[in-house]
Amino acid sequence: MVQPADIDVPETPARPVLVVDFGAQYAQLIARRVREARVFSEVIPHTASIEEIRARQPVALVLSGGPASVYADGAPKLDPALLDLGVPVLGICYGFQAMAQALGGIVAHTGTREYGRTELKVLGGKLHSDLPEVQPVWMSHGDAVTAAPDGFDVVASSAGAPVAAFEAFDRRLAGVQYHPEVMHTPHGQQVLSRFLHDFAGLGAQWTPANIANALIEQVRTQIGDGHAICGLSGGVDSAVAAALVQRAIGDRLTCVFVDHGLLRAGERAQVQRDFVAATGANLVTVDAAETFLEALSGVSAPEGKRKIIGRQFIRAFEGAVRDVLDGKTAEFLVQGTLYPDVVESGGGSGTANIKSHHNVGGLPDDLKFTLVEPLRLLFKDEVRAVGRELGLPEEIVARQPFPGPGLGIRIVGEVTAKRVDTLRHADSIVREELTAAGLDNQIWQCPVVLLADVRSVGVQGDGRTYGHPIVLRPVSSEDAMTADWTRVPYEVLERISTRITNEVAEVNRVVLDITSKPPATIEWE
């Protein structure tokens, strides 16, 4: 048997609540909700061995939902040894059913399915104490627990689930058939908090100040007396990562900012002014706009543009690093990788590789770096909170997500200097009006897209025009995995449309994209 001492255990700022992922679309969301209760959490696949889980020294376990039936061939199984670790356990949906089955309860095909909003009847217990006796919850199940394990109290039911929740408070075990992690379960966060703080007895220690202090100490330990390079993009992730490292090692960090000419209005000046003023970091700016535009000439295909921009960025960054080092040595490269990136890339923990994430990828072989990724355990909202804790200005911390290829993938068609200027002007108007209307905190991001290869007929003054359309794509989201279009007030949309068609040359039409994700992605390209 593999002993815990033989297992590579990732360094974390605190002992985690482990979310055991049984294939749920909401596993990351569960981890986020646990952290919103000020408790550190991580996602681990159900294929992890009991030795691996024990080695992580969890303070509690949450068993996630999943698409399978506990009776199906090849369905994920719950190792009963998990329930003997002596830590509190909460089962959700499939995890609830697997938990019930492992403990001797009965899971059956009742013939009644529940998908979507369902009425939950609270029958007592501690998990739902002080909450409404009848409350809406979000269900997604075909099978149901029809008999709780011995020693468990049935504390809730629904039309399709005679046992919709059970608990054994003295054993610190509980489970719910519904999804407390989704916004469609209004009291779900209270139920999760009740489990974490009352059942598990965990304190609220996962705070921005504690996170920042722990990460700074980790970086200080990793880099020691070494030197580091950080590629700044102008976005919040790289800015906060750089600020943490700068706080840890001071002037032994050098930041490189590549201006590829595809930035939004004022972004280069903002980085040079606000970031340096807030951190005191050494910053080297590379003006590569002309090089990027030359490389993009004649290219309209979205993937082709992405590859060219990525390749040119690597070359510009490589040249800047060589100039900065000038014969000296920097052993570490700082990247703003976030926790969703780690999970989606496989995370080294047996999960499927959905996509690769690299802030700076494909560096030449003779540039040898050890990666420093101080944010790799954080979600976006936590990154913003840490940034505020470090004193970064709101102009950086509250910045909407912006793609690495910049405006290059918000121009549908070939990228030219004139088209970039047109889109940049329209984008600045949209940002000004949304900020003036107080909508920045309601919108995850608002891509502004130029349909450069499309023209439409219009009338301005006494003449006929033949101009380009601009597309507004305001979306609301928590993590960009799913998104809904934001209901921007009509009067704000009217001001935006009027200003763009009056102030931006060759644009005579503004349209609104009202498609959710899925089926559409947030960006057009």
Curated annotation (Swiss-Prot):
<comment type="pathway">
    <text>Purine metabolism; GMP biosynthesis; GMP from XMP (L-Gln route): step 1/1.</text>
</comment>
<dbReference type="Pfam" id="PF00958">
    <property type="entry name" value="GMP_synt_C"/>
</dbReference>
<feature type="binding site">
    <location>
        <begin position="233"/>
        <end position="239"/>
    </location>
    <ligand>
        <name>ATP</name>
    </ligand>
</feature>
<dbReference type="GO" id="GO:0005524">
    <property type="term" value="F:ATP binding"/>
</dbReference>
<feature type="domain" description="GMPS ATP-PPase">
    <location>
        <begin position="206"/>
        <end position="399"/>
    </location>
</feature>
<keyword id="KW-0332">GMP biosynthesis</keyword>
<dbReference type="GO" id="GO:0003921">
    <property type="term" value="F:GMP synthase activity"/>
</dbReference>
<keyword id="KW-0067">ATP-binding</keyword>
<feature type="active site">
    <location>
        <position position="181"/>
    </location>
</feature>
<dbReference type="InterPro" id="IPR017926">
    <property type="entry name" value="GATASE"/>
</dbReference>
<dbReference type="Pfam" id="PF00117">
    <property type="entry name" value="GATase"/>
</dbReference>
<dbReference type="InterPro" id="IPR029062">
    <property type="entry name" value="Class_I_gatase-like"/>
</dbReference>
<keyword id="KW-0315">Glutamine amidotransferase</keyword>
<protein>
    <recommendedName>
        <fullName>GMP synthase [glutamine-hydrolyzing]</fullName>
        <ecNumber>6.3.5.2</ecNumber>
    </recommendedName>
</protein>
<dbReference type="InterPro" id="IPR022955">
    <property type="entry name" value="GMP_synthase"/>
</dbReference>
<comment type="function">
    <text>Catalyzes the synthesis of GMP from XMP.</text>
</comment>
<dbReference type="Pfam" id="PF02540">
    <property type="entry name" value="NAD_synthase"/>
</dbReference>
<dbReference type="InterPro" id="IPR004739">
    <property type="entry name" value="GMP_synth_GATase"/>
</dbReference>
<dbReference type="GO" id="GO:0005829">
    <property type="term" value="C:cytosol"/>
</dbReference>
<comment type="subunit">
    <text>Homodimer.</text>
</comment>
<dbReference type="InterPro" id="IPR025777">
    <property type="entry name" value="GMPS_ATP_PPase_dom"/>
</dbReference>
<feature type="active site" description="Nucleophile">
    <location>
        <position position="93"/>
    </location>
</feature>
<feature type="active site">
    <location>
        <position position="179"/>
    </location>
</feature>
<dbReference type="InterPro" id="IPR001674">
    <property type="entry name" value="GMP_synth_C"/>
</dbReference>
<dbReference type="InterPro" id="IPR022310">
    <property type="entry name" value="NAD/GMP_synthase"/>
</dbReference>
<dbReference type="InterPro" id="IPR014729">
    <property type="entry name" value="Rossmann-like_a/b/a_fold"/>
</dbReference>
<feature type="domain" description="Glutamine amidotransferase type-1">
    <location>
        <begin position="16"/>
        <end position="205"/>
    </location>
</feature>
<keyword id="KW-0658">Purine biosynthesis</keyword>
<keyword id="KW-0547">Nucleotide-binding</keyword>
<keyword id="KW-0436">Ligase</keyword>
